[in-house]
UniProtKB/Swiss-Prot annotation:
Family in the record: Belongs to the DNA mismatch repair MutS family.
Gene that this polypeptide is encoded by: mutS
Name of the protein described by the UniProt record: DNA mismatch repair protein MutS
Annotated residues for binding of ATP: 607-614
GO cellular component: cytosol
Function: This protein is involved in the repair of mismatches in DNA. It is possible that it carries out the mismatch recognition step. This protein has a weak ATPase activity.
Matches recorded under HAMAP family: MutS (MF_00096)
Keywords for the protein's UniProt record, in alphabetical order: ATP-binding, DNA damage, DNA repair, DNA-binding, Nucleotide-binding
GO terms (BP aspect): mismatch repair
Gene3D superfamilies per record: 1.10.1420.10, DNA repair protein MutS, domain I (3.40.1170.10), MutS, connector domain (3.30.420.110), P-loop containing nucleotide triphosphate hydrolases (3.40.50.300)
Listed GO MF terms: ATP binding; ATP-dependent DNA damage sensor activity; damaged DNA binding; mismatched DNA binding
Species of origin: Listeria monocytogenes serotype 4b (strain F2365)
Length: 860
């Protein structure tokens, strides 16, 4: 058995309790890692791997980072989904005999980050917990530790529902029991980008019982208990900033699954996965970090309560009507600090003097914001204004105590104002007078010795000294000057008078800094008493910030106030896609109408690729979402229903569905929509059926349309390349054909991007291929095939189309060798017709590969 050194034994004992984390083991001025942690961390952090004697024949792998710069390394590990256990020396090595005692003082994980550098200002950092009750329902709770937010609900015991909730929140970490983790699918565990943490205890800690209300269900309480226990065990400190748990119902908000939100690019771009080009990016003119976070919450959960929507609309109208007051409001909001996260850091004991200065400056703005809102006539804005708590006593205390120029460090003085504490003033006077005396001493000594270059200096090692260049040392009188330090070109001395004064000055400075830190700590503790009030203030300021952002964006982009229909009808005149219009410019964007009602429930959209079908469909959904978050909408006129759900199937397979084909994903999403949609829902289906054989796809598309028409009655926009489906208008009374128009000019196609009634007369697919700059010979061949197919009622065999005489090189697109004179078999005819009808430009690489496999299987 290996006999490790005492220090390595101590390390291994602590590491055994934190197997799923990197253990940052404090040794002097470094955090060291050993064994496997060292091997892994050296690669991830790109730091040097060394070795240390530890009682074994070979050196133990070791790497380390300086403690004063450790936060950057910790952030890197957390960002990659790892956990870090911070193990500190809890005894003073100078006064301890033998091994210094060490303990883990905090476990930092992706869901428990508190350092500002590891957080994004306008994004929440959520950690969630799950409790499965008899496989019937999930108790679900989540918190943003940095703000103190704590919420809970009960959801159906369905992995889809759980994924929707986790992705809506952009959850970083999920706490589950070991048995719960076992039943979650590998796809969910591997593809969501979550850190899973196993924790079994799920009763409410005694000190946190006040955070839970009686009416909550058992599963909900257990989920909250699991979350609170985990936070208590990992953070190892008071979590007094956690707010009372708020129960919410997912049914109180418009429902959209993860795929719909991604397809509509509400808060995350499909292309770069950032905010650029999303609805959130467009609507965000918030001036505060907490306002930005609330705006994302609003967009993630649009309202379905008519009164709440109208209240927000009224506030936006009022703010738009008071331009100059709104400008003043914006200027005041710019000076408001992140009060939510400040309250969290106060609870953690992590605030410095500059944080308190920013808090004070923020509180200065509150009476001004309140006065501006009260000058308007909106009842809800007046109510918001009256909720603004200026915390006057706290403001006065901070004004009285903290210097404007206070440093970041809280242990080196310069924080507390003169006049705040008489004892501190006494120490400061002694220090300042002593320094004045030293300056006078330098002048006198120069006169006495005649050495004009003589100077009095100070450093932390030797204290005060008189420095004389070596060339002038012979001018010093004997007896008074005691040599203290020898330099290359100078000598440093001390005199009895300087030695005496040095003690007085240094004692005063030391006592001053000790007292100043004590006074600062008292002020910081006082701020703790205001945490709850600051959190409530932050919510009110955030709401005001979101509303002014809506007003500003609506005015700048010429949005109008929508009317909410009572009968479920939708009528939009000259609607625009808000994000596309912003990117393209208002002059370039082509606006379109949209009308849906009980007699016109389904719009079947045809038209060429690149003509704007998908953009049109998305703009209808985004218009509805803008309305239901309380913002104005991009249109000339708009009458909109309140949608309970939006379902979309737009674009290729999503990367969340690992191992599924595009067609399988298509069918799963179609099923999700037609099973869960109601007459109050909106469905957007783009090219359903394209991932399988032509006739299969057409049959499925028709069946889906008929099912929605006969059973669901949801408002539906259905785009298709199957022009045969346009005949459904004759059979289905609630279906209307529309198309995106295009014209040919000089043999070239021009997309007008204008929606018109009726079906498209042709698809212009070859023109799109030409725009994509496919080889000219290929385009010519496709044109001839198309012409022959149209002339022969689509019964032509590809290989039988003769090449014109002027074409000298044979261009053979068929995958199958066919003799020129030989007539194709019926099997070959079907295959060739299928190839001819393929819409190549609409296919993803995966679609094309699937199609090739399918065709190949039909040959053999």
């Amino acid at each position: 058995m290996t006999e490790y050194t005492p220090m390595i034994k101590q390390y291994l004992e602590i590491k055994d309790k934190y197997q799923d984390a990197f253990l940052f083991f404090r040794l002097g001025d470094f955090y060291e890692m050993f064994f496997e942690d060292a091997l892994n961390a050296s690669q991830i952090l790109e730091i040097t791997l060394t070795g240390r004697e530890g009682g074994t024949k070979e050196k133990i792998p070791m790497c380390g980072v300086p403690y004063h710069s450790a936060s950057g390394y910790i952030d890197t590990l957390i960002e990659k989904g790892y956990k870090v256990a911070i193990c500190e020396q809890v005894e003073d090595p100078k006064t301890t005999k033998g091994m210094v005692k060490r303990e883990v003082v905090q476990l930092i994980s992706p869901g428990t980050v508190m350092d500002e550098r590891g957080l994004k200002a306008k994004e929440n950092n959520y950690i969630a917990s799950l409790y499965c009750y008899e496989a019937k329902e999930y108790g679900f709770a989540y918190s943003d530790l940095s703000t103190g937010e704590l919420k809970s609900t009960v959801i159906e015991a369905s992995e889809d529902r759980l994924i929707n909730e986790l992705t809506t929140l952009s959850t970083r970490e999920l706490i589950v029991s070991s048995s719960e983790k076992e039943v979650l699918s590998d796809v969910m565990k591997e593809q969501l980008g979550l850190t899973f943490s196993v924790h079994e205890e799920d009763t409410i800690p005694v000190e946190n019982e006040k955070l839970v209300t009686r009416h909550m269900s058992l599963s909900e309480k257990r989920a909250i208990g699991k979350l609170l226990h985990y936070l208590k065990e990992t953070q190892k400190r008071d979590l007094g900033h956690l707010q009372q748990a708020v129960h919410y119902e997912t049914s109180n908000y418009m429902k959209m699954d993860y795929y719909s939100k991604r397809n509509l690019e509400l808060a995350e771009s499909i292309r770069g996965k950032g905010r650029q080009g999303t609805l959130l990016w467009l609507l965000d003119n918030t001036q505060t970090a907490m306002g930005g976070r609330m705006l994302k919450q609003w967009i993630d959960r649009p309202l379905i309560d008519r009164k709440k929507i109208i209240d927000r609309q009224n506030d936006v109208s009022e703010l738009m009507a008071h331009f100059f007051e709104r400008l003043e409001l914006v200027e005041n909001l710019k000076n408001v600090y992140d009060l939510e996260r400040l309250a969290g850091r106060v609870a953690y004991g992590n605030v410095n003097a500059r944080d308190l200065i920013q808090l004070r400056n923020s509180l200065y703005q509150i009476p001004r914001i309140r006065a501006t809102l009260l000058s308007m006539s909106s009842e809800s804005l007046t109510e918001l204004a009256n909720q603004l708590d200026p915390c006057e006593e706290l403001t006065e205390k901070l004004e009285e105590a903290i210097m404007d120029s206070a440093p970041i460090s809280i242990r080196e003085g310069g924080i507390i104002k003169d006049g705040y504490n008489s004892q501190l003033d006494t120490y400061r006077d002694a220090s300042r007078n002593g320094k004045t005396w030293i300056a006078e001493l330098e002048r006198k000594e120069r006169e006495l010795t005649g050495i004009k270059t003589m100077k009095v200096g100070f450093n932390r090692v030797f204290g005060y000294y008189i420095e004389v260049t070596r060339a002038n040392t012979h001018l010093l009188p004997e007896g008074r000057y005691e040599r203290k330090q020898t330099l290359t070109n100078a000598e440093r001395y001390i005199t009895p008078e300087l030695k005496e004064k040095e003690k007085l000055i240094l004692d005063a400075e030391e006592k001053s800094m000790e007292l100043e830190y004590q006074l600062f700590s008292e002020v910081r503790e006082m701020v703790k008493d205001y945490i709850e009030r600051l959190q409530k203030l932050a919510k009110s300021v955030s709401e005001i910030d979101c509303l002014q952002s809506f007003a500003d964006i609506s005015e700048k982009n010429h949005f109008i106030r929508p009317t909410l229909s009572e009968d479920g009808s939708l009528h939009v005149k000259q609607g625009r896609h808000p994000v596309v219009e912003k990117v393209m410019g208002a002059q370039s964007y082509v606006a379109n109408d949209c009308d849906l009602d009980e007699n016109r429930e389904i719009l079947l959209i045809t038209g060429p690729n690149m003509s704007g079908k998908s953009t049109y469909m998305r703009q209808v959904a985004l218009t509805a979402i803008c309305a239901q978050v309380g913002c104005f909408v991009p249109a000339e006129e708009a009458i909109l229903p309140i949608f309970d759900q939006i379902f979309t199937r737009i674009g290729a397979a999503d990367d969340l569905i690992a191992g599924q084909s595009t067609f399988m994903v298509e069918m799963l999403e179609a099923r999700n929509a037609i099973v869960h949609a109601t007459k109050d829902s909106l469905i957007l289906f783009d090219e359903i059926g394209r991932g399988t054989a032509t006739y299969d796809g057409m049959a499925l598309a028709q069946a889906i349309i008929e099912y929605i028409h006969e059973n669901v009655h949801a408002k539906t926009l259905f785009s298709t390349h199957y022009h045969e489906l346009t005949d459904l208008e004759k059979e289905l009374s609630g279906l209307q054909n529309i198309h995106v128009s295009a014209v040919e000019e000089n043999g070239k196609v021009v997309f007008l991007h204008k929606i018109k009634e009726g079906p498209a007369d042709k698809s212009y697919g070859i023109h799109v291929a030409e725009l994509a700059e496919l080889p000219k010979s290929l385009i010519e061949r496709a044109s001839r095939i198309l012409e022959q197919l149209e002339n022969d009622d689509k019964k032509i065999i590809i290989a039988s189309v003769k090449q014109p005489e002027e074409v000298h090189e044979e261009v053979q697109l068929s995958m199958f060798p066919v003799e020129p004179e030989k007539k194709a078999s019926s099997k070959e005819t079907k295959l060739l017709k299928e190839i001819a009808s393929m819409n190549i430009m609409q296919m993803t690489p995966m679609d094309a590969m699937n199609k090739l496999y399918e065709l190949q299987s039909k040959i053999h």
